[in-house]
Amino acid sequence: MEWVLAEALLSQSRDPRALLGALCQGEASAERVETLRFLLQRLEDEEARGSGGAGALPEAAREVAAGYLVPLLRSLRGRPAGGPDPSLQPRHRRRVLRAAGAALRSCVRLAGRPQLAAALAEEALRDLLAGWRAPGAEAAVEVLAAVGPCLRPREDGPLLERVAGTAVALALGGGGDGDEAGPAEDAAALVAGRLLPVLVQCGGAALRAVWGGLAAPGASLGSGRVEEKLLVLSALAEKLLPEPGGDRARGAREAGPDARRCWRFWRTVQAGLGQADALTRKRARYLLQRAVEVSAELGADCTCGPQEGNGPSLFWWSERKKDELLKFWENYILIMETLEGNQIHVIKPVLPKLNNLFEYAVSEENGCWLFHPSWHMCIYKRMFESENKILSKEGVIHFLELYETKILPFSPEFSEFIIGPLMDALSESSLYSRSPGQPIGSCSPLGLKLQKFLVTYISLLPEEIKSSFLLKFIRKMTSRHWCAVPILFLSKALANVPRHKALGIDGLLALRDVIHCTMITHQILLRGAAQCYLLQTAMNLLDVEKVSLSDVSTFLMSLRQEESLGRGTSLWTELCDWLRVNESYFKPSPTCSSIGLHKTSLNAYVKSIVQEYVKSSAWETGENCFMPDWFEAKLVSLMVLLAVDVEGMKTQYSGKQRTENVLRIFLDPLLDVLMKFSTNAYMPLLKTDRCLQLLLKLLNTCRLKGSSAQDDEVSTVLQNFFMSTTESISEFILRRLTMNELNSVSDLDRCHLYLMVLTELINLHLKVGWKRGNPIWRVISLLKNASIQHLQEMDSGQEPTVGSQIQRVVSMAALAMVCEAIDQKPELQLDSLHAGPLESFLSSLQLNQTLQKPHAEEQSSYAHPLECSSVLEESSSSQGWGKIVAQYIHDQWVCLSFLLKKYHTLIPTTGSEILEPFLPAVQMPIRTLQSALEALTVLSSDQVLPVFHCLKVLVPKLLTSSESLCIESFDMAWKIISSLSNTQLIFWANLKAFVQFVFDNKVLTIAAKIKGQAYFKIKEIMYKIIEMSAIKTGVFNTLISYCCQSWIVSASNVSQGSLSSAKNYSELILEACIFGTVFRRDQRLVQDVQTFIENLGHDCAANIVMENTKREDHYVRICAVKFLCLLDGSNMSHKLFIEDLAIKLLDKDELVSKSKKRYYVNSLQHRVKNRVWQTLLVLFPRLDQNFLNGIIDRIFQAGFTNNQASIKYFIEWIIILILHKFPQFLPKFWDCFSYGEENLKTSICTFLAVLSHLDIITQNIPEKKLILKQALIVVLQWCFNHNFSVRLYALVALKKLWTVCKVLSVEEFDALTPVIESSLHQVESMHGAGNAKKNWQRIQEHFFFATFHPLKDYCLETIFYILPRLSGLIEDEWITIDKFTRFTDVPLAAGFQWYLSQTQLSKLKPGDWSQQDIGTNLVEADNQAEWTDVQKKIIPWNSRVSDLDLELLFQDRAARLGKSISRLIVVASLIDKPTNLGGLCRTCEVFGASVLVVGSLQCISDKQFQHLSVSAEQWLPLVEVKPPQLIDYLQQKKTEGYTIIGVEQTAKSLDLTQYCFPEKSLLLLGNEREGIPANLIQQLDVCVEIPQQGIIRSLNVHVSGALLIWEYTRQQLLSHGDTKP
């Protein structure tokens, strides 16, 4: 149409100057400039044919260029690309720019003045050099793209080079402003799409300049411009890669660049393959594909120079190995394309091809890499970073399995990849989950593969590489945030690496950093196990000649002894053996060298560090100084005990004397100092501190954790040594505590130390027997009296000083220690039960009395000028002094707790208090309780424990008379507990104390008796605890364990009515019986790994060192069930409790059933119902007939509800047991079959299953004939039911019933014999392999009918483990019988054999009866080396045909049809399927598109196309543009003012609902599978995507095109409608 218009204009006016002048007048609209452009192009064509005016035309062109186009472009360049333009919208501005640029190119050609082109280019280049944000940069790009082809390669060569350099810098992001990412990206896209393709056509100088800018070292991968570089490279791929063709083409291109030979090019491609942006990955794949195709077509050898001096090239080609190379690269590209999807079922079939890549890549003859291994790493990196976690896991497993079947040559890339992307992928905890069907407590499959891989890989590493690799591996474990599970399995894998001298001091420090930094917040058991593995790693991999014993001891201190390295564990023994073997090979320690020991010896080292430790330094002067840190004492004690045990290994049979001698050698310096404590008054204070610290740590560390703790010689000898120093130490401590020597804030830590030592000494003497003449006895008595005296003297009201107040705190702490010691050890009772001075003093204490804070100036007089300033600054602050006061109040309540426990019988229970009490704190309990509430508001959460202990004594006494006060104590205590939920160290002790006072049996009994507010408050707190336990595992365990234990004790001590109070709290047992949350995957994973560690038993030292707290949810139910098993059905209170619980369980079942009619398997509803019926089965033996008579209807009714399989089995089982024990209920059972078929539906199967066990039901009935007759009548009716399942169950019941009838030989049934036997025979002999016969065989083999015996299988193991396992219940619900036996808080019932299954049922597997064929085909398929067919994304880059005159085709088609309504062009050249093309053709015709572009016009003859197009192709212009011609076609349309719009999901795609279509729009649709190829994406002006809400995120290309065509049409209709009057 444009050409027709140009012809008409020229025919009317043959003077081009007049015509062009007319067009150059008026407003510079897009339409005017476009008309000028196509008129100039028409004149240019005539000039080329020689028919134009020779003189007038060049002059006219010069005038148009100088007088109109150049000023127009300058005015457009004067405004910034993103700035406001009052006259033109952005899209119209771009349209004007492109039309003006194309017109300018025609003017330059017509004018015949190359200097004009150069001048315009110089001017535009200046704008570009000013940066992309400068005004006119976008216009400058259009000008350069227009005049570039007119520049002369030789004369304008320097200019071309400068333009090319500037363009490359802009395209690589150099034109951005740093913080302006958007403009820089726009510049890169515009320059790469418009300017660079034009420049590389201008000759060798420009092309070399472009390639030089891309391949320069400064533009290498390290600059981080991968996306921009790939944008440019894919745009210029045709010029940067050799042109396949004849010799002439090759000769012409010899001087041109060949990107295949540049290693930077390939590194950029590899980096692109691993980018997060899908479009960047697509461009990288395109470049790889083009390079491979070019290499195959050229047929010439090619090698890319390696980045390093050795190893294979990044890319090479050999014509001799063309087939193998093509096979490798085709598979490689196929895998990379397939990985773009997220569907695992599409990707998994392609993974075997990855194994083939390794076969191609490694030479079997030389054992070296043929292809650079970095290509394989790109695939794995892509898999690791996939959005699909299943694919990530598949990728990790595939990589870890590499060395199982093949040995790959060493490559540095492999090692770097393991340290980098692989370890990053391994940091994902979900990878370590159990496989389906794998039992709980087994090791993670991925953990095992990781261990096997690491062991194999390190064994194959060259010796010189192993050390650096392992060091990097360990350092990587500290370089990021790691969760507990990955660190555990990485540590386990390292621990299994065979012994090798690989690590030095750096490795030891790296291991220490892992423990200190990475694992500090991990779960305790996982952290402990990981520490064990890291110690084993150190022992296996340490080169002892590079480290000293000092280094080793410092590393050992990083291990927490309370979590991993405990004496007596297998790990301790292993460490001792390692030290024994290597002690003479360690590097000499600085300590040993300083005392003249050159030969390394563990004994010498330990002796030296003890001497150094005990020896006082010159700076240890002054009394008011900090107490030393505990680190050194821990280190010395650890090394002493290790050395003693190592010596014991050397002389295994020498006995106690040898141990005593060795210990004496080590500890003589310490013992000498300790013996002088009481006589040397001038001994430095720090020296005494350190010696006492060492004493404590030696006693604590030497305690064995294993089973042989009773006969430990080391511990005995050590205790004897220290007992000999008791008198000296106790005299010293007594002096320090009572003689006003502790008078500064820093001395409070010393007070704590002294009291701990005194407690240890008391324990030592108690072990050997308490004697009244013992020095400790005298010291305790004197300490008690002196402390009381100090406290009484300081109440005189004098002005407080720091010294006096500190002594007051010290005296109260000492008194608290004495009270605790007396309370815990009855042997220490110094006085009779009559109240002595201690009791009288404690009872009259002013509770919660705040210590008055001394004045600051007075404090400073006590301060040492250098050593204590910071401590005193803290004490002078409110917070610092507050801590001291809180400790004082805490110690007061410790003493009071002792007093209340001792004299609890004197506490009055009535509201009236004694007028003149001799023990006020005891005999005035209300006042004491009020003080306790005040203390709870003052004390921090880690100091409330003694207050809770006091409340435990006070609350039962006052609950009746002062209920409101007791309720207030409940509330305040619960507030403290609920705020503590994240503080592990103090939470559990406080919770235990809280439970003991709120749920004390006396409190529960009184509250239930009066039924006041306290009763309801206790129940409220009970439910809050249960609610908290859903978040914090183990909370409910504490409550249920304590209550069950207290009820058991009360039941055994008191006769009738002993459990009556428990009946009032049966909800607690009910909730315990059905307790158990559905954990998130991450929580379940941690629990699985913890179970795995626990199952390791003694092999993992963490299990020995840390006691099993039994905080799993299972133990709540186990506790409740074991409690129920202890109840006696003949005891009336027990019987009432059981019956009340049974009714509540049935209520719960009905409530769950009503809340959700349908529920999925293993949901919380399913689990709760399952637990209800498990508990009812446990209770059944204790239920009598009268009670069952009231609930039997409810049990039968439960059988009619829609239940999961496991619940059905339990209901059927309990019905069988009831009918067996009480046949009187059989009439009600028969009634269940007459409810009406519509009401029953398939639930009748439950009762038919019960009927199949009629032999068990009638076992104790002498007359069975009537029952059998009734059963046969019922069953035969249901054998004719229309439902297949019902018939199947009825036939099984019939078969089993008929077997019983035949055994009894009842004559009345003879008439039925032919009918029944023929029916059963017909069922048995069903022909064929249909479902009916299979299901008949399966139901007969089903465990419930074939193996299960309702009486013999009645045991806890069947109820809680075997039946849930066989019925397909999730493993979380399986409770093994071992857990029942391990839980010792509640004792075993008398008939323990009732717990265990004695039948064959326990040996059955779920696979014996359930269908397990799902997934077997997948397993077989995974092992196949090749797949016959896979889904492949097709890239249409192969076909290359000669260019056609596209515009003539369009003219011809349009002229023939004479129909064009809109200005929309739809390009579908990339679409392959005729169905999609036919549908698009129809849609385009309906909405009036101007033209549909297809890849081949032959498609219109396809029947599928015709079927869907319904003759639309006859009314719509069709143009053929083959895929290789698309770039030229799109460039042409751009110059005609079209906006190129792509339908593609990219990072910068615009939402279709937000995009406004220009009138001249070209819509480019992508291929069905691959989308729009990378080389076309940069031709797009904009990408539009359709907003999607679903999961698949992919629309059919025809549907996508139709949506955009309609949106374009809708917008145009609206805009035209708005312009109408």
UniProtKB/Swiss-Prot annotation:
Keywords attached to this entry: Acetylation, Methyltransferase, Phosphoprotein, RNA-binding, S-adenosyl-L-methionine, Transferase, tRNA processing, tRNA-binding
Gene3D superfamilies: 3.40.1280.10
InterPro entries membership: Alpha/beta_knot_MTases (IPR029028), ARM-type_fold (IPR016024), Prob_MeTrfase_TARBP1 (IPR025806), SpoU_MeTrfase (IPR001537), TARBP1_dom (IPR056921), Trm3/TARBP1 (IPR045330), Trm3/TARBP1_C (IPR044748), tRNA_m1G_MTases_N (IPR029026)
One of the record's GO molecular function terms: RNA binding
Residues modified to N-acetylmethionine: 1
Disulfide bond annotation, renumbered to this chain: none
Protein EC: 2.1.1.34
Residue sites binding S-adenosyl-L-homocysteine per the record: 1543, 1566, 1586, 1588, 1595
Gene source species: Homo sapiens
Chain's role: S-adenosyl-L-methionine-dependent 2'-O-ribose methyltransferase that catalyzes the formation of 2'-O-methylguanosine at position 18 (Gm18) in a subset of tRNA. Selectively mediates Gm18 methylation of tRNAGln-TTG/CTG and tRNASer-TGA/GCT. Gm18 modification can enhance the stability of modified tRNAs. (Microbial infection) In case of infection by HIV-1, it binds to the loop region of TAR RNA, a region also bound by RNA polymerase II. Binding of TARBP1 and RNA polymerase II to HIV-1 TAR RNA is mutually exclusive, suggesting that TARBP1 may function alone or in conjunction with HIV-1 Tat to disengage RNA polymerase II from HIV-1 TAR RNA.
Subunit and partners: Monomer and homodimer.
SUPFAM superfamilies given in the database record: alpha/beta knot, ARM repeat
GO biological process, one term: tRNA methylation
Domain of life: Eukaryota
Residues with the Phosphoserine modification: 1442
Catalytic reaction list: guanosine(18) in tRNA + S-adenosyl-L-methionine = 2'-O-methylguanosine(18) in tRNA + S-adenosyl-L-homocysteine + H(+)
Gene that encodes the chain: TARBP1
PROSITE patterns for the chain: SAM_MT_TRMH_2
Name of the protein this chain belongs to: tRNA (guanosine(18)-2'-O)-methyltransferase TARBP1
GO cellular component: nucleus
Pfam families given in the database record: SpoU_methylase, TARBP1
Similarity annotation: Belongs to the class IV-like SAM-binding methyltransferase superfamily. RNA methyltransferase TrmH family.
